[in-house]
Amino acid sequence: MKILITSDNHLGYRESDPVLLDDSYDTFEEILGIAQRERVDLVLQGGDLFHENRPSRSCLNRTIGLFRRYCIGNERSGLRSNLALNFHDQNIGISIPVVSIHGNHDDPSGISMVSPIDILQSAGLVNYIGKYNLIDRIDVYPLLLEKEYRVAIYGLGHIKDRRLYRMFCEGRIVFHRPEDYDSWYNVLILHQNRIPREKEHFSSDLVEGFFDLIVYGHEHESMVVKGDCLILQPGSTVRTSLCEGERHDKYAYILRIGEECTLEHVKLRSVRPLLLDTLRIEERDNVEEKVENKIRGMIDLGRKKESLFNKEITAIDVDTKRFKCRGDSNEACGAGPVCKGYQLEEKTRIPLVKLKIELCGDEVLDKHRFSAQFKGLVANPSDMLTISRKTRRREEVETQPMAERVEISQILRKILGNVEFGVLSRLGFSESLDEFVKGDSNAFMGMVRKNIEKVVNAVDHSSIVDEDVIKAMKRASREEDRGYEEDHFEPRAALGVLDEMDPGLANKNLRNEYSSRLGGNSEENESKAKKNFNVEDLLGKEYLSKKLRKDKEDSSTDVSFTFSKYL
């Protein structure tokens, strides 16, 4: 069985740029062409297929065209699976099935939580896995595939790293394994930060040890890490930032599962070259001439490397894995298949250039002049230069540690600490604001509708009384807060918000929950906590009761009356 693995294709990246608009599509077409020529059984995509959460019509049109051209044919897939996949549809002749998870760029959003991958799945072109309802627990069931050998694929779409870490630590993510999982080749594919970052990464040490291969999307540098479990970082297929991590070659990977389990990497020829360098100028004379000569030297060197690259054949990277595809054998797997080179239509690709210039004086460089001068020679003339100045050494002063970066959602939650919310969640409100900023104009409408539906469903319509409504409103708000707080949980900040709230609104149970997470005796914390507020006093029991009874009389034919006036 052969599986092509790719990730972070970012289709639609810079599609408004007349030079770079085709880059993401050309490379993705090359990848699908490799899959077709190598006659792979499956394409496994690790998230961020699209660059935008709401891709343009042009982007969707070109993407659908590529899938139809390379994945539909007369030769039917010979795979067998436990789930209904698109190659089971007799009306669509799928020859190369594609299985994909969502990333942080194309994650589900909106009222109906729809991802661009959902659209491709509805069209019968892609099989979408790894989409879960993030409430209390995630049950990950594998996609089981058989063709001579057996593979179990566990998909986990992008989740905010803090929430994912907490859910793993609390045992709220469960991988359901088949009874004879030792006889399957177990693959986990997810879209998270792997490289350690401040509070924002997910370590493979948290994952159970029965996986043979873990595929990390999201990281743009291609990398293979050997160990008890093989870790594959396919990397991106288009350069979306001009940094050191993007300068390396880009690859597609082919996993061969059989008597010998091997992993090959195929260098992608259609990726636009990236040239990075640094220039330090200490003298004030002929500054612009030095910069111009440096850029031209970078371009000439890039052309020489490109000509050498075109003469090379594709390399292979082989890794030995213990054999777990048939029976109980634990024999070490060797390596040996030879990978072929691929002939592509030659395109003239002017390079991306990034030159960092460090000036020691007060010289002035005109970026616009260089931009006009190298237009047609450089793919990004407007942002190819980064200029910094070396400041004179000043007297040493005591440095203070940098304060932790404060996000707008934290500020908003602090402001909303004194706002009386009857049904809506304060944390849900800040989350909806983030979605609104991303471009989802219906974010607030969806939040309100979701919370009202929860209250309506929780109330017994046959014998509705004001106490039932009050309890349902309180419970809905509490459940939403509990769900949203997983993303940006800051215990001490939360206690600070409670301290600033009106004493009548300080919820003892909520404060005890935060205090217990900070450590210490819960009884001692309880004595310091504020008194529990009275929900009936908060909402105005008498006034609310009259209004509810009046609405019930006016809505005798429709018991699902509106709660909007009580929010």
Curated annotation (Swiss-Prot):
User: Where in the sequence is the active site?
Assistant: 105 (proton donor)
What cofactor does this one take?
Answer: Mn(2+)
Q: Which residues of this UniProt protein bind Mn(2+) 1?
A: 8, 10, 48, 220
Q: Which InterPro entries match?
A: Calcineurin-like_PHP_ApaH (IPR004843), Metallo-depent_PP-like (IPR029052), Mre11 (IPR003701), Mre11_DNA-bd (IPR007281), Mre11_N (IPR041796)
> Where is this gene product found?
Nucleus; Chromosome, Telomere; Chromosome
Instruction: List, alphabetically, the Gene3D superfamilies matched.
Output: 3.60.21.10
Q: Which GO terms describe its molecular function?
A: 3'-5'-DNA exonuclease activity; manganese ion binding; single-stranded DNA endodeoxyribonuclease activity
For the keyword Heme, the answer is no
Q: Name one GO biological process term.
A: telomere maintenance
Q: Record's Pfam families?
A: Metallophos (PF00149), Mre11_DNA_bind (PF04152)
Where do the annotations place Mn(2+) 2 binding?
48, 104, 191, 218
Q: Which GO terms describe its cellular component?
A: chromosome, telomeric region; Mre11 complex; site of double-strand break
Keyword terms, alphabetized: Chromosome, DNA damage, DNA repair, Endonuclease, Exonuclease, Hydrolase, Manganese, Meiosis, Metal-binding, Nuclease, Nucleus, Telomere
**Region (Disordered) residue spans:** 513-533
Subunit structure of this chain's protein:
Component of the MRN complex composed of two heterodimers RAD50 and MRE11 associated with a single NBS1.
Read off the PANTHER family from this record: DOUBLE-STRAND BREAK REPAIR PROTEIN MRE11
Q: What's this chain's function? A: Core component of the MRN complex, which plays a central role in double-strand break (DSB) repair, DNA recombination, maintenance of telomere integrity and meiosis. The MRN complex is involved in the repair of DNA double-strand breaks (DSBs) via homologous recombination (HR), an error-free mechanism which primarily occurs during S and G2 phases. The complex (1) mediates the end resection of damaged DNA, which generates proper single-stranded DNA, a key initial steps in HR, and is (2) required for the recruitment of other repair factors and efficient activation of ATM and ATR upon DNA damage.
Stated family: Belongs to the MRE11/RAD32 family.
Recorded protein name is Double-strand break repair protein MRE11
- Source species taxonomy: Eukaryota, Fungi, Fungi incertae sedis, Microsporidia, Unikaryonidae
Question: Gene symbol?
Answer: MRE11
